[in-house]
Amino acid sequence: MRLKKTLLSIAIAAATFTPAMHSIAAPLQLQATLDQESQIQSSNTWLEIDLGQFKQNIEQFKSHMNDQTKICAVMKADAYGNGIAGLMPTIIEQQIPCVAIASNAEAQVVRDSGFKGQLMRVRSAEIGEIEGALDLNVEELIGTLDQAKAIAALSKKANKTVKVHLALNDGGMGRNGIDMTTENGKKEALAIAKQSGVEIVGIMTHFPNYNAEEVRAKLGSFKESSAWLIKEANLKREDILLHVANSYTALNVPEAQLDMVRPGGVLYGDLPTNLEYPSIVSFKTRVASLHHLPKNSTVGYDSSFTTTKESVMANLPVGYSDGYPRKMGNTADVLINGQRAKVVGVTSMNTTMIDVSDIKGVKPGSEVVLFGNQKSQTINAAEIEKNADVIFPELYTIWGTSNPRVYVK
C-alpha cells in the first residue's frame, strides 16, 4: 500500500501515534519510530532519517558559533523534507532557542512538540495567514509599509501586539526587503517602526550567493542601514536581533554571525561548501520482481534501452511520482547488495528498472538505496544533481511529502 503524506497529514499522523510525538523524551520518540517502521513494511519506498547524525550536525555547527549568537533552526518545507515532528525532540534536547518555519501548519507542529521558544516565519505571509498564527505566537517577516499597516489593523482587532522581523534588501535578494539606499525606502522603514501594535524584534537580510567577499561587502551595507534605522526610529538596540547569516554565511563569514544565525541545509547535511556535515536522510526501496530478458530486448517507454546480452532486470516500485526523476533513466546508479546497479530505460511514474545481471544474491525484497550509503558505496547529492539535472533541495522536499519516514539512531 502506498503511503502518500502531505505535511498536514504527517502532523496529524504523528499526533495519533502516541503522546510521544508531543514529548521531549527520547524513549517515547523511539516508540513512535517503531510504529513508523511497521508502516514502511507495507510501503514501496521510505526515507530513513538518522537522528544521531542530526544531533551531531547541530553540535558541530554550534562549536563554530560565537557564544552570544543565537541559533534559529530553519525547519521550513517540513524540515527540508525530513519531518518537523520527528526532529523536534532533538531540537528541544539541544536547547535551540528559535525555530523558523514557513506555514501555519508547520508552526502548529512545532508548538505541538512542546517547543516554547521563539518561532519566526521566514517568508512573507498574507494577512489571513498571519491572523491564523496569532495563537501560535509566530513572529512575522515583513518588508513593506502596506504589510505593517495590515498587521497594525489586525493587532487592534485582536488586541494583541504582533512581533515582526523587518527585512532590508541590503543582501540583494529583492524578494522581501526594503531598499534603504533611497529616501523613500528610509521613510517607509521609519513609518513601519511607528505602526501601533507592530513590534520590531529583529532586522534581517539574506544573501543570494555563496561568495564570502560579496557577503562581507553587503554586510557592511546592512550594518549601516540597521544602525541608521535603530537610531532614527528610537528603537532599543538591546531589544533588536540583527541576523543575516544562513548556513554558508554563518560558517564561512564568522563576522556575519551577529545576534542570530539561521542554519537550514547544514543541519540536514545539505551544504555543498561544507561536506563535513553528512546527510541525515537515505531514500530506499525494495526489489518487487526479477525479469530475465533475452538479447535485444527493449526496456521502458520510448524503447530507450536495449539489452546487449541475456540480462536480469530488477523491477523497483518507485518512479517520478515518488520523487525519483524521469531523467534518472539510463544515467543513474542505485545500490543493491553493496554494489552499484545501472538504472535502465526511462523511469516511469511508479516503476524503475535496474540491471542486476552481474550482481549475485538479488531477490524480491532486496533493499535498494536510491540515495545514501550501503556498505562501502555511496550515492551522494552531487551525483543525484548531475543525473537529475536539478538542485538537490528540489528532490528531497518532494521525497518528504511523498514517502513515509522512519527515524533511526
From Swiss-Prot:
UniProt keyword ATP-binding present: no
Any one GO molecular function term: alanine racemase activity
Binding site for substrate: 175, 349
Disulphide bond pairs: 72-98
Signal peptide range in chain numbering: 1-25
Gene Ontology CC terms: cytosol; periplasmic space
Cofactor names: pyridoxal 5'-phosphate
Catalytic center residues: 76 (proton acceptor), 301 (proton acceptor)
Pfam families: Ala_racemase_C (PF00842), Ala_racemase_N (PF01168)
Keyword Ribosomal protein tagged: no
Keywords, ordered alphabetically: Disulfide bond, Isomerase, Periplasm, Pyridoxal phosphate, Signal
Subcellular location: Periplasm
PROSITE patterns listed in its UniProt record: ALANINE_RACEMASE (PS00395)
InterPro entries cross-referenced by the UniProt entry: Ala_racemase (IPR000821), Ala_racemase/Decarboxylase_C (IPR009006), Ala_racemase_C (IPR011079), Ala_racemase_N (IPR001608), Ala_racemase_pyridoxalP-BS (IPR020622), PLP-binding_barrel (IPR029066), Racemase_Bsr/Lyr (IPR043698)
Catalytic activity: an L-alpha-amino acid = a D-alpha-amino acid; L-lysine = D-lysine; L-arginine = D-arginine
Modified residues (N6-(pyridoxal phosphate)lysine): 76
Entry's EC annotation: 5.1.1.10
PANTHER family: ALANINE RACEMASE, ALANINE RACEMASE, CATABOLIC-RELATED
Known function: Amino-acid racemase able to utilize a broad range of substrates.
Family that this chain belongs to: Belongs to the alanine racemase family. Bsr subfamily.
Protein name in UniProt: Broad specificity amino-acid racemase
Top-level taxonomy: Bacteria, Pseudomonadati, Pseudomonadota, Gammaproteobacteria, Vibrionales
